[in-house]
Amino acid sequence: MFQFISLGSGSSGNCYYLFSEHGGLLIDVGIGIRTLKKHFQTYGFSLNDIQQILVTHDHADHVKTVGVVSNDYGVPVYATEKVHKGIFNNFCVHKKPPVNLLRHVIPGTAFKAGDFEVTPFTIPHDSSDNVGYRIVYDGIVFCMMTDVGHVTDEMKAYIAEANYLVIESNYDEDMLRLGHYPKRLKERISNGTGHLSNAACANALVTHATARLRHVWLCHLSEENNHPELARKTLEQALREREMPSEIHFGFDVLKRKVPGKVYSLE
């Protein structure tokens, strides 16, 4: 059994849970502890089953509650050295993870985390550091790519390998261009170290997906500069225009910003 659920995806808070029958891991903990407890109770999960926390980067919407979970449940926190330092310097993280539960990861170096084999890889973003994760369980490859400034060659290879993929589709280019954000913020989002547009996400998928890919989740949609239906239609149009080979056919969903999605079985 290998399952996945999104508990929040967007600037209001990001948190994802991957689990097997023996326990699971959280990817980012950017939602409040009361919200996390409520969601776990709703789905019949136990916070005592969380064996690891993987952190992508040190922005508040990804790490706000990482120290609370680590302290209260004795959960080790995996992140790069720069991200660990960023967490300790982030005033939004009021409770810091215990030093004895810090685990340092190095991009490109695989490690075991409970039942899972995990490989972090670099993703360009304007944080202290940022990584995606390739997570393998029983031969199934799950990849997480969030807060993506642009798609690198290394990321393209992981897209090609993935059976299941979470990838950012943050903004619609026209909505951002015509929206109320100041010029400096618009440039920060779109300059290659900010976030990934719907069009860039769709292009990466139709260009690099293989027959291995079974399902995609579009994550971290902007509330101001995107809409779930726009993200969906952009990918659907790209798939039609590319005329994908018949052996490549994957499902996809758009993850909700503030409420959990359904539990997906990864088979």
Briefly describe each language-model feature range.
Residues 12, 59-63, 85-86, 128, ...:
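Active-site environment of divalent metal-dependent phosphoester hydrolases
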Residues 64-73, 89-91, 226-233:
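Metal-dependent catalytic neighborhoods of phosphoester/phosphodiester hydrolases
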